[in-house]
């Protein structure tokens, strides 16, 4: 009985997801360079943020507008929050008003040219009653049929329910020109043990991909902050149907989970370490690495970082956005805390600076590969291509500890130079972009086999060309 009914659901959803393929977003993993994405055959670099609409569409449009005006082109949105959850009172009963909201959200996406990925669930509990502070991740609706999350993701009736809800949402968005991906579950390891989330993930990645072959499908785990999480990520990375590897990592000075020292230090190292782990885990089956959540928290994820109100210049945000791409990720860091940090401090312009920095850069056409080196107390993270190399150079003399914790202003870095022996001797000129002043200096001749870098504060972008 289950297999017959489920097959009908799969067929129905497959028709929904494929019927209007001509209008889909058509964002895919590049076949030429599978570390990156393409849109309609051209390289697509996501400049992305997380955003959870919670109040009304006036507020949502404000966020979309601010983000789009500053170069943003992608958002990750939980479709399971109170504002959007269609299954809000009883399992299998879907609220048409919430479905209409999903359509309205996609209208905003189209208006502002922002591509959307939906996270299908963020639940950690299924119960009739829960404490107010835990209600954000509980489903009372599913408690009308399931006793807990384990039953929901492990039983035949639970998986049938999961796919039925997906098919209803897919009817509204799967072929929308600004909808590109599904995420099975936010940080599913926080809800159930590995013995349950791993088989569910393997099965559902395949089933959701079969239902919606025109969208990307992925799964997410919690912050990559300790050895046990590395093991989880390694197993996730090995699943072929996981179209790209989503990594979460936060600045966290706590010790509850034996957090690595690297997640308590400079953001460029925190990020590059995570990206390198992802690249290593997927070296046999290359796919894009995406820093799907990045931010700063109070120790042991007790809340948004106390550093945020102090960071009016976006010292943290700059590193959150830039470090992933220059470390080998497929796009910018997908930032969290839009409501506690980015919007209150009006820091959206940092996304625009990233867009300006990568102007004319095509990692697929150039077959770019990540590399890094340190010189003169500066960490340099680069992407080397056939005819050009782009570098993000981060001064080690200052970071969030010196500026935000200790209150020491960043010093100007002077007399910095990049010997071409670190990279390649074929380049003849270079350009400089300062992301803090939004100023370019272009086509500077290379002399004495090195690039002489003008004085800068915190970081600088260098593009070397033949």
Question: How would you describe each model-predicted region?
Answer:
Residues 186-190, 249-264, 273-313, 339:
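Active-site clefts of carbohydrate-active enzymes
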